């Protein structure tokens, strides 16, 4: 179904996305796409509406600000105390520094990470 063309729409909102949210948006968007002239999809296509996922990347300062209070994974360009990957609760982010509460073996520790040293950041699932 859908040939080789896929139109993917990612949606998000505070509190997360439900299956009902994706179904409702699909029901609204699909008929509207059919009214566009000239048709941007002359061949059959598949419409895919979904959320960015549980482990979505945090690519901007705004995304990190919105993730305060969430469990995240951060990879660094430069290690801090010989550690390049931290996973824990993002306690704060002021635009320049991330503060993360993480487990070091059996103890909670807090680390301040300069934003410019962050290579990648994403939400993480706490197991």
Curated annotation (Swiss-Prot):
Family: Belongs to the RimP family.
Keywords: Cytoplasm, Ribosome biogenesis
Predominant location: cytoplasm
GO biological process entries: ribosomal small subunit assembly; translation
Gene Ontology CC: cytosol
Subcellular location, record wording: Cytoplasm
Stated name of the protein: Ribosome maturation factor RimP
Key word Cytoplasm present: yes
Primary gene name: rimP
InterPro entries listed in its UniProt record: Ribosome_maturation_RimP (IPR003728), RimP_C (IPR028998), RimP_C_sf (IPR036847), RimP_N (IPR028989), RimP_N_sf (IPR035956)
